UniProtKB/Swiss-Prot annotation:
InterPro entries: NA-bd_OB-fold (IPR012340), RNA-binding_domain_S1_IF1 (IPR006196), TIF_IF1 (IPR004368). It is found in: Plastid, Chloroplast. Pfam families: eIF-1a. This is Translation initiation factor IF-1, chloroplastic. Gene3D superfamilies: Nucleic acid-binding proteins. Residues 1-74 form the S1-like domain. Keywords: Chloroplast, Initiation factor, Plastid, Protein biosynthesis, RNA-binding, rRNA-binding. GO terms for cellular component: chloroplast; cytosol. One of its GO terms (molecular function) is ribosome binding.
């Protein structure tokens, strides 16, 4: 059976080498940063992820310190 994953929204705080990012989750009580990597669909689509951007991240129940960035959210303050 496929492993269940949590999906959270968060804020990119730091860009690391090899498509890795530090992400601060919104709906978690503690202020821990988790390590996020970019999903293949985002890589193929050449979607730019920069510090300050809001993302959806998929976190495994077994290892809650790492996650996969699956979607970049639009900025609320832009006129798009």
């Amino acid at each position: 059976m496929k492993e269940q994953k949590w999906i959270h929204e968060g804020l990119i705080t730091e860009s690391l080498p090899n498509g890795m990012f530090r992400v601060r989750l919104d709906n978690v009580d503690n202020e821990d940063l988790i390590l996020g990597y970019v999903s293949g669909r985002i890589r193929r689509s050449f979607i730019r992820i920069l510090p300050g951007x809001r993302v959806k991240i998929e976190v495994s129940r077994x290892d809650s310190t790492r996650g996969r960035i699956i979607y970049r959210l639009r900025n609320k303050d832009s006129n798009b």
